[in-house]
């Protein structure tokens, strides 16, 4: 009971810190906005005050995108690590990032797509098709879905799709590469409220599915045979979990580009704080990953003002060394 209360207080503290980070995201940037003006802009927009327009039309949408995409990547990473029982698993193992990138570059190079909405549709389509292909390739006729087969299928498909993407980029006109790299770098600039519609619904459905599977994932952590003895339908659990990962990682990749590291490290930090229970790991992963991506976006705006560094690049630059320190300080078995 005491541990549950501590976890609940930890979630509450994390939510409060995330709210403060979101407020900082609205106020900070190439042109800082005073906190009082930021709060006024959230309550009622003054169309004659350009600071209100900066907060409401530019920073609020990208803050929401960072929160949604980060939470989705964190939960997707926790699901992947629970399913494969591999501490290095992350959403990219399903080929979702590679599938989304290939679909976007095909759309830009062959169909001259230019708007963020069009990128969004292509990325989500490519991510979904890649995830379905990996799930089908990971099936074993005798035992159903196999974690090792799934990881190998995802790694192989990712390499193949990345190669195709590279071929198209190298042979495309320079303007095609310029349009593609903005999305591929994981930049959140240019996000608008219009882009949050159906990706937000997909993330909501994925989160609901993931949280509903938490108890089954706890049973599977004991081994497939014990899980089956406890009444867990392994094939159905795998199917629903993979569907949740595809929805979460696909929508996040479509919104923010192929963000690496966030979905890998957030579940490890969540386990350090919450223990091995997936009912707590999943919400902690959502909060931590949302904070990591939002923090990377804020830092990218401050370090390179008046321009900015894409959040995906900042996450890679800071995340790699931080994860190495984390692994060296704590035994891998504890992670």
Roles of regions detected by a PLM:
Residues 1-335:
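Alpha-helical transmembrane segments in inner-membrane proteins
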């Amino acid at each position: 009971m005491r541990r549950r209360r501590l976890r609940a207080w930890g979630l509450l503290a994390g939510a409060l810190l995330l709210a403060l980070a979101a407020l900082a995201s609205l106020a900070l940037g190439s042109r800082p906005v005073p906190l009082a003006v930021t709060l006024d802009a959230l309550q009622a927009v003054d169309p004659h005050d350009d600071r209100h327009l900066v907060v409401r039309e530019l920073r609020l949408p990208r803050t929401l995108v960072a929160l949604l995409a980060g939470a989705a990547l964190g939960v997707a990473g926790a699901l992947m690590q629970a399913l494969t029982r591999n501490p290095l698993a992350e959403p990219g193992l399903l080929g979702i990032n590679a599938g989304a990138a290939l679909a976007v570059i095909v759309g830009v190079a062959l169909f001259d797509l230019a708007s963020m909405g069009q990128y969004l549709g292509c990325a989500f389509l490519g991510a979904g098709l890649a995830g379905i292909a990996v799930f089908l390739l990971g099936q074993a006729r005798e035992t159903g879905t196999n974690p090792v087969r799934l990881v190998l299928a995802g790694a192989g498909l990712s390499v193949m799709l990345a190669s195709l993407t590279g071929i198209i980029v190298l042979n495309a006109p320079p303007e095609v590469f310029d349009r593609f790299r903005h999305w591929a770098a994981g930049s959140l600039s240019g996000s608008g409220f219009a882009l949050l519609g159906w990706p937000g619904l997909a993330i909501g459905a994925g989160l609901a599915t993931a949280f509903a599977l938490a108890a089954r994932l706890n049973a599977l952590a004991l081994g497939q045979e014990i899980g089956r003895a406890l009444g867990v339908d392994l094939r159905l659990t795998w199917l629903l979990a993979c569907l949740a990962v595809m929805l979460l990682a696909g929508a996040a990749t479509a919104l923010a580009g192929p963000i690496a590291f966030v979905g890998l490290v957030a579940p490890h930090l969540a386990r350090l704080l919450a223990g091995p229970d997936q009912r707590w790991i999943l919400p902690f992963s959502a909060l931590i990953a949302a904070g990591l991506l939002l923090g990377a976006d804020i830092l990218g705006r401050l370090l390179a003002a008046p321009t900015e560094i894409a959040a995906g690049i900042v996450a890679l630059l800071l995340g790699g060394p931080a994860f190495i320190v984390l692994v060296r300080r704590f035994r891998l078995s504890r992670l």
